[in-house]
Amino acid sequence: MSKKQEYIAPIKYQNSLPVPQLPPKLLVYPESPETNADSSQLINSLYIKTNVTNLIQQDEDLGMPVDLMKFPGLLNKLDSKLLYGFDNVKLDKDDRILLRDPRIDRLTKTDISKVTFLRRTEYVSNTIAAHDNTSLKRKRRLDDGDSDDENLDVNHIISRVEGTFNKTDKWQHPVKKGVKMVKKWDLLPDTASMDQVYFILKFMGSASLDTKEKKSLNTGIFRPVELEEDEWISMYATDHKDSAILENELEKGMDEMDDDSHEGKIYKFKRIRDYDMKQVAEKPMTELAIRLNDKDGIAYYKPLRSKIELRRRRVNDIIKPLVKEHDIDQLNVTLRNPSTKEANIRDKLRMKFDPINFATVDEEDDEDEEQPEDVKKESEGDSKTEGSEQEGENEKDEEIKQEKENEQDEENKQDENRAADTPETSDAVHTEQKPEEEKETLQEE
């Protein structure tokens, strides 16, 4: 037969061997499960006959009870002894041998640094550092003195964290080892400016400014223009002297500013050039603007919402007249203190970040407090005269209403009298109109 036929129809050969002379026989062996050493009945009988004392207290489920709430001071004081067991126990030199791996004699040590084939040197150094740190993570650091007696209270943790900032000698730069810390600032949010939205303006390519322009741009105004045909942003700047004065005035608080000093002072911002703008959306709180206050030793940060890229603008000849209409060559800017309404609107936005320092003020109460007593008396007298005038006007209105009602009644009576005479006249009118209608129908035919 061929190999193909073997897969289709395998041939079965008959086995004609004789039966063995002494075939095996199965023996019947009676077995009782009670006599086995593993039987539950035997264990119960031994447990009942002999007095067995439990070495470990067991509950109904034959389990050892472990209740952490019974440890005194575990949750209230957070005692490090009960939390971390034997981590902080100091061992003798003779007992440290017991902590090593029992298979240390059999293990073959391989120097990982020599394995350089198909691997870069930076990967080898990372694996060595990671291998060394795994053993250090398991062991807790032993502090000088009796560290076990200290409790992990909230106030204790805060004091230890704040104390680390006072020691400037121990701080090191993560990359530059030669750099040392000289001074520290407390990093806090600038809640006074959280009511405004801040952007990053980046001049791209040929739109970058010269050194002279950068010095004169201590204060500047960027005016965006958005139309259906095109959109751009215009940059305005002032003189170097005015920009320095304006910068100092803007940094002052509301209490320090005087309206008398700003009267008549106009800051002229002239248009320098226009730019094409492109807004780049970024995740919030990815970039911050930090303002340092050396007097108080505080660094205030402001979140920057998004980023705007400014590029050199090239205008088509078709749009040039439209651009000239919407461009402004000069902006005249003056400063003043905000009103109560404006301050309340800003404070409501600031309350989301600092509800304690920025609370809304009632506008009516402020107006009453600002007015002197003489003005209040005059206002009360005016209100009384206005009240008497209003009463006189109300009386006149009532008299006019009564006269109108009387006139309407007389007109209704006259209409009723006319209605009685109208039926006869109406019939006459209808009879006179019928022949005219008949004439019109004949003419149409």
Swiss-Prot record:
It is found in: Nucleus, Nucleoplasm. It comes from the Eukaryota. Residues 361-372, 388-397 have a biased composition (Acidic residues). Residues 373-387, 414-445 have a biased composition (Basic and acidic residues). Residues 358-445 are annotated as: Disordered. Belongs to the PAF1 family. This is RNA polymerase II-associated protein 1.
